[in-house]
């Protein structure tokens, strides 16, 4: 087996490792001890809860908008993204977003180390959530 200790798993809607860090983040993949080669996080947010512009030095980030309207900034570029839209934000470039919707926004975000040598020490977004947030739920049957 190439990935000792790693087992396949499936999660139903609403399942995952849910951490509260101001808002609830549900980690679908990438939680501690499960081989962080990528992270997939689902969360709901609203206008006024946007993170400040920031930079990830070692990981690329992808957003898929499940519901809502946002304006993403990445360096000098801006992208108007709505329901079903996708944006890729490469490492090393300052980025952020502004919510344009009056209602809640639901997002899927994927982060992954952009360089193979970064994987060994990569904690990424999930490690930040684990450190700052309170674990409120774990999926049944996933050890």
Positions of predicted regions on the chain:
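Short beta-strand segments in beta-sandwich/barrel cores
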Residues: 49-51, 63, 68-73, 86
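Double-stranded beta-helix
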Residues: 100-143
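A generic "binding-loop/recognition-motif" signal
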Residues: 58, 77, 93-94, 103, ...
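Short acidic-glycine-tyrosine-enriched beta hairpin
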Residues: 12, 16, 33, 69, ...
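Short beta-strand His + acidic residue motifs that chelate non-heme Fe in jelly-roll/DSBH
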Residues: 53, 72-73, 89, 95-101, ...
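A short, N-terminal "cap"/entry segment at the start of jelly-roll beta-barrel domains
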Residues: 1-38, 132-143
């Amino acid at each position: 087996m190439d990935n000792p200790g790693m087992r396949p798993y499936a999660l139903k809607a609403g399942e995952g490792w849910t951490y509260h860090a101001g808002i609830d983040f549900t980690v679908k993949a990438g939680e501690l001890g499960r081989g962080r080669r990528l992270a997939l996080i689902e969360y709901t947010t609203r206008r006024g809860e946007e993170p400040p512009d920031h930079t990830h030095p070692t990981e690329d980030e992808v957003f898929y908008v499940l519901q809502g309207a946002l304006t993403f900034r990445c360096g000098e570029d801006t992208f108007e993204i709505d329901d079903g839209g996708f944006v890729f934000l490469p490492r090393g470039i300052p980025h952020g977003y502004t919510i344009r919707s009056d209602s809640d926004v639901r997002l899927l975000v994927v982060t992954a180390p952009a360089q193979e040598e970064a994987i060994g020490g990569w904690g990424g977004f999930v490690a930040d959530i684990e450190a700052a947030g309170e674990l409120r739920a774990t999926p049944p049957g996933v050890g």
